[in-house]
UniProtKB/Swiss-Prot annotation:
Residues 119-132 have a biased composition (Basic residues). Residues 85-378 are annotated as: Required for the interaction with GRB2 and sufficient to promote the phosphorylation of AKT and cell proliferation. Keywords: Acetylation, Chromosome, Myogenesis, Nucleus, Phosphoprotein. Residues 23-46, 73-150, 189-241, 290-445, 525-557 are annotated as: Disordered. It comes from Homo sapiens (Human). Changing S101C: Increased binding to GRB2 and enhanced cell proliferation. Residues 193-205, 337-356 have a biased composition (Pro residues). PANTHER family: EMO2-RELATED, PROLINE-RICH PROTEIN 14. Residues 136-365 are annotated as: Required for nuclear lamina association. This is Proline-rich protein 14. The modification N-acetylmethionine is found at M1. Its main location: nucleus. GO terms for biological process: muscle organ development. The gene is PRR14. Functions in tethering peripheral heterochromatin to the nuclear lamina during interphase, possibly through the interaction with heterochromatin protein CBX5/HP1 alpha. Might play a role in reattaching heterochromatin to the nuclear lamina at mitotic exit. Promotes myoblast differentiation during skeletal myogenesis, possibly by stimulating transcription factor MyoD activity via binding to CBX5/HP1 alpha. Involved in the positive regulation of the PI3K-Akt-mTOR signaling pathway and in promoting cell proliferation, possibly via binding to GRB2.
Length: 585
């Protein structure tokens, strides 16, 4: 099937175009058979390693080829891809895909196969020599602990030049190289071609692949590192990359593919059954205690702020812990409790409540019915403790270790819902002192006012208290003269008394003062009408007082009478003149 844009001759094998994203859903597609061993990585890991394979080498090929001595051939090192007319043809098998650049067009019949890197078990001493000794990006430090059952990545070099029939059924934009493979024993091999010395480029080798001297162009095969059934590294020839233009393309895309593979396509760890472990209980605490000491012996008691988990598991539960005094850790309020063996468990379970359970008041889940658990000690530290010995019960009230892990220190007063009569603790040094417990309070013990506080009525609008004035009418002389607000009257406020001390002025005795005082009142005659005071506006409008020389004299009447007579005479003259004028005309 001819793909669009395929310029290769019809007789030569074509390059199947396929995007890199097909590796993600194609690996999980039900139409494609999965060749995955029990120790093989997941399809997502294969897809991520397929992208990593594109980044690591320009034309690096990873192929899943079992080792069969009868079918494998070796090619000498000096053999070039221009001089190889005959290529081996492996049997057909389900195709495996990988991404290739859209600008890569091989001018000769060479099939470059890209398949995901994978890890296999070490089967021989030769594979152990080729196995990786340092963890790569896809192998975290957590895998160093269980190194024995983990598979190993084997990198081998082999010739990749072989003809293949044109693949059908893939119509995508990015070309993809597919080579079938089917052998007796499955074994994943990384193939890397070697270019001629004139066109040699230093390949990109991150820490994902081992720094093997075979990555550089070899000059002679190494018999100590080669299997007799696999081709020597001298037969691995790298095609010339200048007509394809792969080197500049991979240099530009390399950083993007690396970041994409590191972020999104980090392979998952091979699922393994977890080792059987005792039941663990997570405890929410605030301050993280100090780290456990690695050199602590098995039979000695812990002196750290809390007994380390190693001592909890290895220490004998029948030996009681002897603590002379509580050693406080970083929280300075948490005594050391020692291992929770049956000998040290002296805290009794919570007695049954005499009253019926009532719903909690100040909790997030307000509807839950809460019986009073054993009173928790106010030490809050984030720690992990196992649930106790062999025969310990995981319940809260019967398990000694769970009681020890949930309650660290006893408050001074019992809870409100529990009974008042509690057994005294076995060791008083493990209980907090009184000043420490008095500072600790519970929300349920805070008193809540059911009625609001009465507002004070004698406050000013600014909130200041108003002065309280007495309604008392009669005051004694002591109250008057001792009152801070009392002031003696000034000269203006002094009263004139009837009997006054006479003063002598100019040889005469003056019994009364001449100045007017406020107590001098003039009593008017009530029968006379009151004189109205003119308003200030009218007084201002008048504005001026009549001078006394312009005031009317007493002979105004005769003067007015004379003026009126003159006016009458003038009017009579005018009437007589009017009567004579029309007669003249």
């Amino acid at each position: 099937m001819d793909l669009p844009g395929d310029s290769s001759p019809p007789g030569q094998p074509r390059l199947c175009r396929q995007p890199l994203t097909r590796a993600l859903w194609g690996a999980r597609s039900p139409k494609r058979p999965r060749l995955q061993l029990p120790g093989a990585p997941s399809p997502l890991e294969k897809a991520s390693r397929r992208v990593l394979a594109v980044v690591l080498e320009d034309v690096m090929a990873v192929h899943m080829v079992p080792v069969v001595p009868s079918k494998q051939t070796s090619i000498p090192q000096h053999h070039s891809y221009h001089q190889d007319p005959v290529h081996r043809q492996p049997p057909a098998s389900p195709p495996r895909q990988a991404g290739w650049s859209s600008q890569a067009r091989p001018p000769d019949p060479l099939c470059l196969c890209r398949e995901p890197l994978s890890r296999i078990h070490r089967t021989s001493s030769t594979l152990r020599r080729r196995s990786r000794t340092t963890p790569g990006p896809e192998e975290g430090p957590s895998q160093k602990v269980d190194r024995a059952p983990q598979p190993t990545l084997v990198v081998m070099l082999e010739d990749i030049a072989s003809p293949r029939p044109p693949a059908e059924g893939f119509i995508d934009e990015t070309p993809n190289f597919i080579i079938p493979a089917q052998r007796a024993e499955p074994m994943r091999i990384v193939r890397q071609p070697t270019p001629p010395p004139g066109d040699l480029e230093p390949p990109f080798q991150p820490s994902a692949l081992p720094a093997d001297p075979l990555e550089s162009p070899p000059t002679a095969p190494d018999p100590a590192l080669e299997l007799p059934s696999t081709p020597p590294p001298s037969s691995l020839l790298r095609p010339r990359l200048s007509p394809w233009g792969l080197a500049p393309l991979f240099r530009s895309v390399r950083s993007k593919l690396e970041s994409f593979a590191d972020i999104f396509l980090t392979p998952n760890k091979t699922p393994q059954p977890p080792p059987p472990s005792p039941p663990m209980k997570l405890e929410l605490k605030i301050a993280i205690s100090e780290a456990e000491q690695s050199g602590a012996a098995e039979g000695t008691a812990s002196v750290s702020p809390r007994p380390p988990i190693r001592q909890w598991r290895t220490q004998d539960h029948n030996t009681p812990a002897l603590l002379p005094k509580p050693s406080l850790g970083r929280s300075y309020s948490c005594p050391d409790l020692g291992p929770p063996g049956p000998g040290t468990c002296t805290w009794p379970p919570a007695p049954p409540q005499p009253s019926r359970p009532r719903p909690r008041r100040h909790t997030v889940g307000g509807g839950e019915m809460a019986r009073a658990p054993p009173p928790p000690r106010p030490c809050l530290r984030k720690e992990v403790f196992p649930l106790g010995g062999v025969g310990a019960s995981p319940s809260l009230t019967t398990s000694c270790s769970s009681t020890a892990s949930t309650s660290f220190s006893e408050p001074a007063e019992p809870r409100l819902g529990s009974t008042k009569g509690k057994e005294p603790r076995a060791s008083k040094d493990q209980v907090l002192s009184e000043p420490e417990t008095k500072t600790m309070g519970k929300v349920s013990r805070f008193r809540i006012r059911r009625t609001p506080a009465r507002p004070q009525l004698n406050l000013t609008p600014m909130g200041l208290p108003r002065p309280i004035r007495l309604n008392k009418k009669e005051f004694s002389l002591e109250e008057i003269y001792t009152n801070k607000n009392y002031q003696s009257p000034t000269t203006r406020r002094t009263f004139e008394t009837i009997f006054e001390e006479p003063r002598e002025r100019n040889g005469t005795l003056i019994f009364t003062s001449s100045r007017k005082l406020r107590r001098a009142v003039e009593f008017r005659d009530s029968s006379l009408p009151r004189s109205r005071r003119p308003s200030r506006g009218v007084r201002a409008a008048g504005g001026r007082t009549v001078p006394p020389n312009v005031a009317p004299s007493p002979d105004v009447g005769p003067l007015l009478q004379q003026r009126l007579e003159e006016l009458d005479a003038l009017l009579l003259e005018e009437e007589t003149v009017d009567r004579e004028q029309p007669h003249w005309t």
